[in-house]
Amino acid sequence: MSGHSKWHNIQGRKNAQDAKRGKIFQKISRDLYQAAKAGDPDPDNNPQLRLVMDKARAANMPKQNIQRAIDKATGAGGANFEEITYEGYGPGGVAVMVFCLTDNKNRTAAAIRSAFTHSGGSLGATGSVSYMFNRQGLIEILRDGLDKDEDDMLMDALDAGADDMQATDDKFQIFTDPSAMTSVRDALQEQGYELETAEVTMIPENKTKVPADKVGQYQHLIDELEDNDDVADVYEAAFVEDADQGE
């Protein structure tokens, strides 16, 4: 029994690691697509694409996955992918936005609607929750190995054209106007900074606490959305209390 139990524990950890790795690859694929779509598909002529490709290699993302994401943007793979945004409410009334890249709108719409419905949420009309989010540029720089304190980093960010900065224990988060993200990114790179993230994202104005009895349903919704191959990104205005605090 102990050997059987040990095997299941190992398998369980492996499955969790595989799921986490898959979500990382999914986000990188989205970033590759957007970088290639917005600029030249040749990384030598596209700094943003080059940055994301470096991140993909660091995450040990297979070469064919990297190329597939770029092909989606250029149409080289033969399929015509569309960008579609879905908006809705998760369990507890939490606003959720789902960005998709799909070659079959009917398939994607059915899957997204099913995810919301089966989790106790509801899919809304265009504009039903997007007003609760702000579109912003986000640049992240890891603090590890960085010879800069918070004040110096803030001055460099503002000089580069950023709007604001927040510091956490492990990183600096630099916020920009969406149209200025590229120029701020380039200015920081010219100063020698290594960027962990440089993207335009959706940031909620306020977060809604998920009721304790809805946390399981809510997490099921997010997991189902993120596991869908058509889903490029999920933005949520949720505050989820730690399990230990909720009990």
UniProtKB/Swiss-Prot annotation:
| GO terms assigned for molecular function | DNA binding
Q: Which GO terms describe its cellular component?
A: cytosol
Q: Which UniProt keywords apply?
A: Cytoplasm, DNA-binding, Transcription, Transcription regulation
- Location(s) in or outside the cell: Cytoplasm
Gene3D superfamilies, A to Z: 1.10.10.200, 3.30.70.980
Is Oxidoreductase one of the keywords UniProt gives this record? no
> What are the recorded Gene Ontology BP terms?
regulation of DNA-templated transcription
Top-rank taxon = Bacteria
List the NCBIfam families.
Answer: PRK00110.1, PRK12378.1, YebC/PmpR family DNA-binding transcriptional regulator
Report the family membership: Belongs to the TACO1 family.
Q: Would you tell me the protein name for this molecule? A: Probable transcriptional regulatory protein LAF_0541
The top of its lineage is:
Bacteria, Bacillati, Bacillota, Bacilli, Lactobacillales
